[in-house]
Amino acid sequence: MKEIIKNPLGHAIMLQVMGLVLLVAALLSFSILPAEAEDAASAEAQELVNKARLSFQSLLRDPNMTWFRDHLKDAKGVLIVPQLLKAAFFVGGSGGSGVLLARNEKTGEWSEPAFYTLGSGSFGLQFGAEASEVILLVMTPRGVEALLTSTLKLGGDASVAIGPVGGGVQGATANLSADILSFALSKGLFAGISLEGAVVAARDDWNNAYYGKAVRPLDILMNRSVSNSHSAELRATVGKAVDGK
């Protein structure tokens, strides 16, 4: 030990080597983290796709969703939010992630899913908490075009009307001229769900991770320049329902 200490040159070289090892390890960690983060985002996105398919099937089976089934064939797009969380005591707010599929008017084929978030805030004498499965039927080209932007405000950039709510609670009479019709299944204490004023925003991080490159909603929904085979079940489920199968 004394000999090592008395050899300052050898000690300095050893310290340099250790420093280089630590530097390389740090650089490797920085190069790995983004890839790991992207893999995690892709896995979360796929989980949302799987849940969206189950939520879509739930609404199809619900006896209160007659309007939903009747108007599905006329939809230009479908935005599925498997879990919209809402909690309030005097101030209410809601939020959740969802997937949007658009229909090709010529072929009838449904696009790959694009990922979005849906969020809103409300004020009023509301009490309770709920988690709702929400589906928005995009009924007009204007509604689809509005969703191609990075963000849109429901009721402003595109009109929205409430459809029937599950669990035996009926929503307001649907305005069939609206750009978007909303349908929900809920077991909470709220009598219904109003999306007037809600903001819909594209989830660029999940879109990029799911398709392995930087993409816009336009690329996914209209240009159809990307694909992911793991979305096949969801697209097939929506397609069969529209065709009445």
Language model feature labels by segment:
Residues E38-K245:
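Small-residue-enriched, tightly packed secondary-structure blocks
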Residues Q16-F30:
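Bacterial N-terminal signal peptides
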Residues M1-M14:
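N-terminal secretory signal peptides that target proteins for export/translocation
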Residues H11, L15-M18, I193:
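N-terminal secretory/membrane targeting signals
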Residues E3, L28-S29, G77:
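Residue-level detector of alpha-helical hydrophobic segments embedded in or interacting with membranes
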Residues I32-A37:
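Sec/Tat signal peptide C-region and signal peptidase I cleavage site
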